[in-house]
Amino acid sequence: MTTTAFAFVLAAYLIGSLSFAVIVSKAMGMADPRSYGSGNPGATNVLRTGKKLAAALTLLGDGAKGWVAVALASWLGPRYGLGEQGIALCALAVLFGHMWPVFFGFKGGKGVATAVGILFGINPWLALAALATWLFMAFVVKISSLSAIVACVLAPVYAFFILGPHSVYFGTCIIIAIVVVHRHKSNLIKLMTGQEDKIGNKGDAG
């Protein structure tokens, strides 16, 4: 890895390490989202407080940082010799930063909103396809975690058709899907045992 690529990847990781669930909650005088509910610093868990604005700001912040990291790498990177592989690494770095943030004790979220932001940075149509899948599943089954898992699993399929099997971002989407689904392992166990709560109820989908 070149020094330039390392700098961009490190910057992406640091951007990802900005946990908006914690930042927004602290700014609004709320408890640390890691101390209640599922313990997950994400929009769903913040919503459990009943503070819809805080949850919305968390969702937007987590999604925006995924887009910003990829967009900056895409716009500025080529000027310094950063190719698509380097941009793909930045996409993964911002996601890993969200999940294991250096600024917050490496205890981060599950990455759904950030993953969507990353997809928007890669290709808006790809992101819209994944987002539409989540919305459709949420409407049908009304389970946030299952909707997120299905959307993540199908994202590489959409990438295959939209970007092509030889695109470096196709591989990136596969890695994102694997990591995000793995972060939902506790939700998968609850889904298999019929204990996962539906949207609007208290649970661990955040």
Curated annotation (Swiss-Prot):
Catalytic reactions of this protein: an acyl phosphate + sn-glycerol 3-phosphate = a 1-acyl-sn-glycero-3-phosphate + phosphate
Membrane found in the keyword field: yes
Coiled coil: none
Pfam families: G3P_acyltransf
A single MF term (Gene Ontology): acyl-phosphate glycerol-3-phosphate acyltransferase activity
Top class in the EC scheme: transferase
Keywords: Cell inner membrane, Cell membrane, Lipid biosynthesis, Lipid metabolism, Membrane, Phospholipid biosynthesis, Phospholipid metabolism, Transferase, Transmembrane, Transmembrane helix
GO biological process: phospholipid biosynthetic process
EC number: 2.3.1.275
Membrane topology: Multi-pass membrane protein
Subcellular location: Cell inner membrane
Entry-linked InterPro entries: G3P_acylTferase_PlsY (IPR003811)
Gene Ontology annotations for the cellular component aspect, listed alphabetically: plasma membrane
Subunit details: Probably interacts with PlsX.
Function: Catalyzes the transfer of an acyl group from acyl-phosphate (acyl-PO(4)) to glycerol-3-phosphate (G3P) to form lysophosphatidic acid (LPA). This enzyme utilizes acyl-phosphate as fatty acyl donor, but not acyl-CoA or acyl-ACP.
PANTHER family: GLYCEROL-3-PHOSPHATE ACYLTRANSFERASE-RELATED, INNER MEMBRANE PROTEIN YGIH
Protein name per its UniProtKB record: Glycerol-3-phosphate acyltransferase
Organism: Chromobacterium violaceum (strain ATCC 12472 / DSM 30191 / JCM 1249 / CCUG 213 / NBRC 12614 / NCIMB 9131 / NCTC 9757 / MK)
Lineage, broadest ranks: Bacteria, Pseudomonadati, Pseudomonadota, Betaproteobacteria, Neisseriales
